[in-house]
Amino acid sequence: MEETSLFINFETLDLARVYLFGGVKYLDLLLVLSIIDVLTGVIKAWKFKKLRSRSAWFGYVRKLLNFFAVILANVIDTVLNLNGVLTFGTVLFYIANEGLSITENLAQIGVKIPSSITDRLQTIENEKEQSKNNADKAAG
């Protein structure tokens, strides 16, 4: 007689993780940073009274799509036999992105951030705005 258990078989989950993500390093860090980013984003929105469920859902979907991008990178990595280089690079990109987002959220919440970091964030924001303005001018 087969016994049913309510406990999760973590070995099966680990196999699924390796199959989907290729056992790439720092995936756990990306997950933790994504959760911290969501939490700091919610705190920031709450502080500025801009907490909207629709905006939050779009943010959650974006986070989920980041992990889909890692899965896609792993598939391409496997097909092209790149030994995990593309997947690792993709994870590092998203880790850097999450780190920037968390730092921006913390600065807007009012947490003291070293000036060297805030100066670099301001430079990145200015470059983003300049690129967007150039794209808008080119479009029309």
UniProtKB/Swiss-Prot annotation:
Respond yes or no to whether keyword Transmembrane is given for this record: yes
Which keywords has UniProt assigned to this entry? Cell membrane, Membrane, Transmembrane, Transmembrane helix
Q: Where in the cell is it found?
A: Cell membrane
Show the stretches that span the lipid bilayer. 26-43, 64-86
Q: Which InterPro entries match?
A: Phage_holin_4_1
Primary residence? membrane
Q: Which Pfam families match?
A: Phage_holin_4_1
**GO cellular component labels:** plasma membrane
Organism superkingdom: Bacteria
Signal sequence, renumbered to the chain: none
Recorded topology in the membrane: Multi-pass membrane protein
The UniProt similarity line reads: Belongs to the bacteriophage holin family. Cp-1 holin subfamily.
* NCBIfam families on file: holin_tox_secr
Name of the molecule in the record: Uncharacterized protein YqxH
Q: Which organism is it from?
A: Bacillus subtilis (strain 168)
**What gene does the UniProt entry assign to this protein?**
yqxH
